[in-house]
Structure formats: structure tokens, C-alpha cells
Amino acid sequence: MNFRYTIQLLLTILTLLCFSCKKETPGNAGILQLASCTIGSDQLKYPDNTSGIINDGNIIIIFSSAVDTNSAKKNIHIILTDNSVVSARFSFSEDLTTVTMDPDSPFGNNTNYKLSITTSLKGIKGENFAGIEFTFTTANAAFVIKNITINNQNFAPPVKGKNIALNDLNISIEFSASLDTTNIKSHFLLAGNPVFNTEITSDGSIIKLNYTGLLAGYTNYNFAISSNLKARDGFTFSGFANSFFTKLDSTLKFPLISDDELLTLVQRQTFKYFYDFAHPASGMARERNSSGDIVTTGGSGFGVMAMVVGMERGFITRTHGISHLNKMITFLETCDRFHGAWPHWLNGNTGKVVPFGTKDNGGDLVETAYMIQGLIAMRQYLNPGLSSEQDLIDRINVLCNTVEWDWYTRGGQNVLYWHWSPTYAWDMNFRIEGYNETLITYILAASSPTHTIPASAYHQGFARNGGIVNGKSFYGYALPVGYDYGGPLFFAHYSFLGLDPRNLTDTYASYWIQNVNHSLINWKHCVKNPFKYVNYNASCWGLTASDLSTGYGVSEPTNDRGVIAPTAAVSSLPYTPEQSMNAIRYFYYIVGDRVWGQYGFYDAYDVGRNWWATSTLAIDQGPQICMIENYRTGLLWNLFMSAPEVQSGLTKLGFTY
């Protein structure tokens, strides 16, 4: 403890004792006592130093009785270590017991001060004061960003920059103190390590960063300021990080061609997935471009229809197509089947089931339906006048007629079940109910000449006794059946690669209106863009099941993740020709440098997460080539609908077509 403060404290105590013990008499002034002294929320301590005092607070001094205001102004001082006095304005409470000192300028940062109240201070009645001196130290200033903008947009987190120009990046940062300019450029960090041009204002508190190099379009860039940055007076900085999205690079990535040529190109490139990339031993379609020997039943059914398109358009010769089909049929005849149904996945070499899940190691009736849809369309395309093709027709008929659709009613219930396993039997317990992508399953089951199901299974099982009816409008488009907003767009594709919806109606819906409006709702949702995803627009749309940055999942208006899957808009071409054609142009010409690959459009992308898939999936590639063909010529629709058993099945279920 400071010796001088010790002596002063003892004298103050002795004085207080003397006055408190002495009986007052007329003409004997009393004692003025100090009740408290605060700066901001901090109580000044005595005799200890009080640290961490805010630099813009008032000093509030409370006495036991009223003070003489003139005496207070002369005898209460804020003093620096060099004994200079800090000027301040005084104000007093109505009863004159409280003195408020408001310094003319804020206290310095990390600075020592004294608050001196001398013995000459008097109360309003002449009371004496023993005198006291407090010491305090102000807090070190926070060196912080006061304001930051990027291309004139607020850039303070959580706000992120959007649609930032590709060739003129400007970041302006105002700090709370002047900058130490030593190696100043090294403290401002951007992916790719570009060198900023810098401009600092005369007071050193504002820095302007400019980069005129070319940034990549539709890219999430991380910008950071190092915590090694310092203020001129030595104060440290805690660091800064934020990100921004660049605007779309709208330059054409490929030369312009006619729309007809573009559609042919998309079909030709996508066809390669089912022919060039087909499993060499089985001819089947691999689940995805990284699946090795795993082949998929449903995706291969789409591939059979793609083979029709490939032969018809001359992507391969008919001889090569027939040879490939023979390989596939041979595999389908000898691979694992479960009461006639194929499993979801198979090993393309051995033909053995590859479990899709723990208990999903048996028949998958929906995947089987997609295969049968493709085989029937192919059968109708083959020429019975050629012995080699008649042989394939006969073998296709055997495959179709040995699917035990009725077995999958699980003992004659009025519903179909999705799975059956020789190990787990019906443990999956998944009823095939609508409205979704499984409509074709009921139509083919009703069409079977050998293992048919009753119409009641369709109406009670799939249609749920009318439970599939919706009837509401979304974004101005009426939806006859299904979930609100329609669900993912693959509902409008998988069953309708062969099944022609143009004139298809039953007691529940017009399926042309259903699919058109479902597609328009999906498109309009992306145009409205309620979640403000950076890449959505009238030409960039399409929510369906696809790969995601985190795995695989379903996107739809009610579960919008910001992920665009080209297959959604491309495969809706028959339903929304204008909107889908705009999307095809956009995917190819504008973002084709990122979404166009060896087998057509990659599966999906998410600009907001800076994620662009390089994967292709059979169930997403197949609908594109097939639905483009249905838009152009109606080929697959016409073939499938020409099958007599299909017509019988539709009539049985109460459809008109």
C-alpha cells in the first residue's frame, strides 16, 4: 500500500472519529461523508486501484448530505499521471447530494487516472470533508470492425454477400482504431490467395480492398482477416470470417446449336451410360457411375427403353442393340428371383442378390415393375418376322409371365407389398400405396395373364379408397391427386416412361393434368424461391430425389434443400416443354462446364454449399433419354400402350386411355 495513502486514510479516520464523538454545538459545522463513487457500473475502491473502467462513463459521487456546488466544482478533480486536470461538466441532483461529472472527452484507453476530492470541499451548511483520492485504470480498447461492406452490400455476419461481380471485388472495412500498416496486405485472406489493391484513409481506420482479377462464377468464397492484424497503438484483433457468392458466369460454355440438335446430344450422351458403361458381363445398368459390379433392376428397366431409343436414333446399330438385349435377358433369366420378382440390386457378375438393406435381400416388386415396363416396350419394338428377334420376344414373355404379382398381395389382401425376403419373409411390411411413383406396379399386376390381381387391390391398396385425391391448388395449379405441392418430380416420370398419360384418366384423376400441373408447381416454386436460394430462377429449376452434398435424399417444395437435379426438369419435357427446354439450355450452355459430363448431366448441384456432383445414377439418367423421346415422337408411349395385356389391365382397373 502507498505510504502517503496510508497516512491519509488514518488522518481521515481520526477526523471522522473526532467529529462523530464531539457533541455538536451552535456554530460547529458537521461532517460531510462520502456514500459511494461509481464510473459506469463499477464502484471505485479505496485504497486499491480499480481497473477495467469503461472509457466513456460518467463519474457519479453520492454524499451523505447536500454539497456546496461551487465548492464541489473547485475541489473535485480528475487528474492524469502528469498531474494535468481532465475537464468535465458538473451536474447535481435536486437535493444536491449527488454530483455527476461528465468528462468533455472519453477517457484514454488503458490509462491511469486519479479522482481527487480535497479537504476543502464543503457541504451546503459548511460541513467539512476529510478528503479522499481514488485511483483507477481504464480498459484496453476493443479493436473491432465498426462497418464492413462488399460491393456496397452489408457484409457483417450473419449476412453473406450475394451475386458479387466476377471481375471487380471491393471490400471496405472501418475499424475502431487506426491500423498498423506493417505487412498490411498479408492479413486479408481470400481463397486462391489473390493480391488486393489497398487504400487506407488518412486517419488509418478505414481500408478499402480491391481485386480486379477474375473470380469463378457461382462460387462460395471464404474471406478472412487474420487475428495477427494490429492497431497502430498495439491493440490486437480477434479475427474475422465470412463468405460470399459470386454471380452467375453467363458466358456460353459450349457453341450454340439448334434445340433439336441439343436434344439429340443429350439423348446420345445419356445413352452411353446404359450402353458404353453397362456392366460388361450382364449388360445391366450399374446403380451409379461408382458402383462397380452392383447393377440395378429398375434402372436397367429404364435402360432397356433407352436401348430402344438408341437403336431407333442410330446411336448404335440394331444388330448391336439386339446383341446387348440378349445379354441382359440371359442375365435376367438366370439371376436371383423371388417368386418371379428381381431384387433391387444384383451382382452383375454372379447374378446374386446384393442386399439393399438389412432385410431387403429378396424381391422388390416396384423395381421389378420398372423392368417389366421396359421389357414390354422393347418386345413391342422387336420384329417377330426375324427369328432372332422372335426368340427375344418369346423369352421376354416368359420373364413377364413368371412374375408372381399375386404372391405379393401377402395372402390375397387388397394391396401389393413392396418386398419379400426368403430370410425375413414380410418383415419389411411396406404396403405399396399411392399416390407416388408406384402406379405402374398395379397396372402391370392387373395386366398379368398368369398372376393377376383384382381391381379392388388397386382401389383399396394404391388409391386408398379415394385417399389419394387432393383437389387443392398450389401456385395457381390444381393438383388432382397426391401430396400437397405434388412431391418430388420422379412421381411424374418413373411410371410414365412407357405408360402414356396424355389421355389416361380414371375415377381419381386425369394423369395428364396431374403430371403437367405437378411439373408446373415444381417450376413455379423455384421461380418464387421462398428460401432465396442463390441459383433458382425460371430456367434453373427441378426438385426430385438425387444426390446431395450430404448423401442421397428427396427434394420437393415442402422439403426444399437448395439442390437442383437436372433430371427433374429435363424429364418433365413432355409436360412443360417451354420451361424444360429453357432448363436444358441453361444446364448445357450456362452451367455446362460443371454439370455436363461423360454420360450427360451430372446428378445434382447446390450452389449455396458450393457442391457440384460428379455422379450419374441409372434412375436419373434413364428418365431423361426416355422422356425426351416421348416428347419428340411418343415412341415409348406408343410401344407400351400397344401391348394387348396392358390395355386389358387398364380396362380392368377402370382407366380410359
Predicted regions and their residues:
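Bacterial N-terminal signal peptides that target proteins for export
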Residues: 1-10
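Basic side chains
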Residues: 4, 22-23, 313
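Hydrophobic alpha-helical segments, principally membrane-spanning helices and signal/leader peptides
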Residues: 7-8, 49, 103, 255, ...
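C-terminal motif of bacterial Sec signal peptides marking the signal peptidase cleavage site
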Residues: 17-20
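Short, flexible, glycine/charge-rich loop motifs used to bind or transfer phosphoryl groups or to couple energy/partner
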Residues: 23, 49-50, 161, 293, ...
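Acidic, low-complexity Ser/Thr/Gly/Pro-rich repeat segments typical of extracellular/periplasmic
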Residues: 24-251
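Ser/Thr/Asn(+Pro)-rich, low-complexity disordered segments
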Residues: 250-657
